Every structure is written in C-alpha cells, then in structure tokens.
Amino acid sequence: MELARHSFQQPLNVAPSLSNVVNKTSVVLQQQSVIQPNQHQLQHQLQTMHDGGIDGKRREILARRPSYRRILDDLAGDGPVKMENYDDTGSSGESSPNGNNEEDINGINQSVSHQEKQYQSIHLNGIVSSVQGGENSLNQLHDSQPGDNQYIITTQGPDNKIQAYTIKGTLPIGLDNTSLASPHQLAEEATRKRELRLYKNREAARECRRKKKEYVKCLENRVAVLENQNKALIEELKSLKDLYCSKGD
C-alpha cells in the first residue's frame, strides 16, 4: 500500500514542475516579444527628432533671409541696387538688371559712401560722439544759437573739405558753454593764458633777484666782521710780541 501510494504521488509532483517550465518559457517569449517593439519605436523616435531638427534649422534660415534683404535695402536707399527675392522653398531669383552680383555690391558701396559724405543731424542727450569714419578729425564745437540746445561740429577731411554736423540735445556732464567758443575766443583765451604765464615767470625772476641781493649783502657783512676780527687779532699778537721782547731784554 505504501509503494502504491508513493507511485501515485510521483505524477502529482512532476506535474507542477512541468507547469513551471511552461510558465518560464512563456515569460521569456513574452519578454522578447515586448523588447523588440521598444527598440523599433526608439529608433523611429530618434529618426523623427533628427528630421525635425533639420527642418527647424531650414525654416530658421529661410526666416532670416527677408531680414537680410531688408537691411541691405535700407543701406542701398534709393539707388539702383536690387536684391534677390527668396520664396518659401529657399530658391532665389535675381532681380538686378544685368544679373551681375559684383555690380550690386559696387552700388551698395557707392551708396553707403555717399551717405557718409552727407551732412548728418544727430539727436542725443548724452556724450557727443562723431558718426563719421576715421578719416575726419574734430576741429570745432560751438553753439549755433544760445538757448536752443543745438550745437554744430565742424570737421575737415583729408581732401580739405569742411563738413558740419548738427547736434541737438543737452550738454553732457563736464561740458559747459564756456568750452563751446568760437576760434577768435579760443585765440584770445590762449593769448591770455600765455600772458599770465609770462607774468608769473617775471614775478618769480624778480623775487629770485631780490633774494640774491639780500644774500650778497649778508655775505658782505660777514666778510666785514671777519676782517675786523682779523685786525684785532693781529694787533693783539703785536702787543704780545712787544711784551715778550721787553721781558727778554
């Protein structure tokens, strides 16, 4: 009976082990089936992000092109220069008469140089600055009309052409109306300063001569005192010599 009972219990123990093996294999297969779709989805997302970044850069470049065209149009002014027209696809169509980019660039340079040579009016409330290139130097700065806060800068270029700039606004800190003088007033101010410097030099030389005379008088008095003392010593020596000679006899 015990042997038969033992034989009946063995199938009962084997059955759970087989069920465990089946469950494990099903789990492994299920995990593999889950991992593979995740890898494909990740690659698809990376590819989508990469394509989206390229499209974003392309749209940004296309969005910038009209601003460049507007800036160059502002620089060209009313000149004959015409810029390229860009559409949404990024293609460009030249609208210059001869289709030559070098002529367009030369026209831009000529228009810019022409604008630099013209007189300009500057409205500011701060430090006075020059908008001209490095060729011209500031020569004069004077008030055009008192009380209207309008000043004129006169410059002279390398070709000896005088140009003027009008500045409207309040004076900066440290700059007053006294410094905004005409050339005649500036010359008078320079002459006055030179005369004042010469006057101070003459006064210093006069004081030096006076002190020199006083020093010479002091030396002369000292010499006279020393001469008197020398004479007194000579007479005293003579008297001592006579006294010694008389005692010797």
UniProtKB/Swiss-Prot annotation:
Keyword annotations for this protein, in alphabetical order, are:
DNA-binding, Nucleus, Transcription, Transcription regulation
Q: Which CDD domains match?
A: bZIP_CREB1
Give the start-end ranges of region Basic motif: 192-217
Q: Which domain of life is it from?
A: Eukaryota
* Residue intervals of the KID domain: 35-94
Q: Where is this region: Leucine-zipper?
A: 219-240
InterPro entries cross-referenced by the UniProt entry: bZIP, bZIP_sf, CREB1-like_pKID, Leuzip_CREB
* Domain bZIP residue range list: 191-249
Q: Which GO terms describe its cellular component?
A: nucleus; transcription regulator complex
What GO terms are given for molecular function? Answer: DNA-binding transcription factor activity, RNA polymerase II-specific; RNA polymerase II cis-regulatory region sequence-specific DNA binding
Q: Write down the Pfam families for this protein, in alphabetical order.
A: bZIP_1, pKID
What Gene3D superfamilies does the record tag this protein with? 1.20.5.170
Annotated segments matching region Disordered: 73-106
Where in the cell does this protein reside?
Nucleus
Low complexity compositional bias: what residue ranges? 90-100
Q: Give the multimer and partner information.
A: Binds DNA as a dimer.
Q: Which family does it belong to?
A: Belongs to the bZIP family.
Concerning PANTHER family, the annotation shows:
CYCLIC AMP RESPONSE ELEMENT-BINDING PROTEIN B (PTHR45879:SF3)
* Role this protein plays: This protein binds the cAMP response element (CRE), sequence present in many viral and cellular promoters. Could regulate the transcriptional activity of genes involved in regeneration processes.
> Know the name of this protein?
Cyclic AMP-responsive element-binding protein
Q: Which gene encodes it?
A: CREB
